[in-house]
Amino acid sequence: MVSSRRNTGGIQRDGSLRDWSEFVDPSPSPKLLYSQSYVAMRGLLSSLVSMDFALLSSRLKSAWAAILSQRHTRSPERSKSRGLSCKRLAFHLFVCFMVGIFIGFMPFFSVDVSQKIVSENGRLPFDEGAVDRGMVDGKVKELETIVVEKEVDIIDESEVEESPPVPAMLDDEADFVESAPAIPDINDLDITVRKLLIIVTITTVRPQQAYYLNRLAHVLKTVQSPLLWLVVEWPDQSFQTAEILRSSGVMYRHLICRKNTTSVRKIAVCQRNTAIYHIKKHRLDGIMHFADEERSYMSDVFEEMRKIRRFGAWPVAIHTGIKYRVVLEGPICKGNRVTGWNTIQNIQKKSAVRRFPVGFSGFAFNSTMLWDPERWNRPPMDSVIVHSGGRGGLQESRFIEKLVKHERQIEGLPEDCNRVMVWNFNLEPPLLNVPPGWSLHKNLDAVIPVT
């Protein structure tokens, strides 16, 4: 029985080995083919199948011994492989680091260095060290200026006559050169700079307004530019005045004075001060003149105004109202220097004594005196306006005293003040019954019918 069990056990072991050998992968192991641990584990599994405990214990011992021996044999191999992998990783990191540095310092655009910047030894200035870009730009500008100066000197020299002859041009080129207009020199151009004339006119809606404004507009239209016409109306902008200014052909500004009063003198003061405030606000630089619409002007007086530096005056012909007598009021001059005054005070005994006996239509001044007192050595807080107090010409005289202190500061116009260019004739009738705007909305009755 014992022998039969052993034979059957041996037979089962052989069969078990054959059965397990059928499931073994015949492909070689990637690391170690049929190592000792592999053989031990194979025997262990075969003993488990055969259920032989004595053989199983021996197989376990041999498998354990094989595993221990494999650990001892693999430990130096693993340490060597780990060392090789660390070195390889460090080498890769070093290579990547160097490539990154190289890319970081590589310029992304081409630097164009001028060939003119060359040192004495024939080398570029950045061969020996860092270059200051500002210094390089300065050297480039210096070299360019030197080259331009040398070219100008070469052109200015008398040796230009020895230059080689100019090659002959084609017929088309010759025609083009002859037809091209020559550019004149700037010194040959006849350019005259004229001062701005600021003409202030006060007006109100009344029957003779259209006549006065149109007459003055035609005179101003003949004056050479630049000219600005400041028309100040009370109390509102009327359609009639706006139409006259729009059709005048003169550059204008339509201002209004809204003072609530019925005094003609106070209304005129408000209108003139409105124009003065407008000039101060916008800092208009020119020659300012109060041109009343009732006055008759020659266009020559406006051209004479442009000669004024600070303050200028001229004689005015005034109708006194005594029969047909006309008196000249204004300065007496020797050249352009004022030596005395003509006045109507001898005719009108009741008139007050004036420091400067001249009306608004007889003087003009530089508008910067209104808003730039430091330029004319005047107190900064001394405001120049027209005051409502004063009759018989005192209003104009007090206004002039704000601008000048002595006749030496006044320029007489024209030369020797021997020409009358302004007339003051009061020809306006007291009352007229006229249609508004001098426009007829319906036909009048026929005085002489057509038969």
Curated annotation (Swiss-Prot):
Its EC number is 2.4.2.-. Its main location: Golgi. Residues 110-451 are lumenal. GO terms for cellular component: Golgi membrane. One of its GO terms (biological process) is xylan biosynthetic process. InterPro entries: Glyco_trans_43, Nucleotide-diphossugar_trans. GO terms for molecular function: galactosylgalactosylxylosylprotein 3-beta-glucuronosyltransferase activity; xylosyltransferase activity. It is an enzyme of class 2 (transferase). Glycans are attached at N260, N366. The chain crosses the membrane at residues 89-109. It is found in: Golgi apparatus membrane. It comes from the Eukaryota. Residues 1-88 are cytoplasmic. It is a single-pass type II membrane protein. Keywords: Cell wall biogenesis/degradation, Glycoprotein, Glycosyltransferase, Golgi apparatus, Membrane, Signal-anchor, Transferase, Transmembrane, Transmembrane helix. Belongs to the glycosyltransferase 43 family. Probable beta-1,4-xylosyltransferase involved in xylan biosynthesis in cell walls. PANTHER family: BETA-1,4-XYLOSYLTRANSFERASE GT43E-RELATED, GALACTOSYLGALACTOSYLXYLOSYLPROTEIN 3-BETA-GLUCURONOSYLTRANSFERASE BETA-1,3-GLUCURONYLTRANSFERASE. This is Probable beta-1,4-xylosyltransferase GT43E. The gene is GT43E.
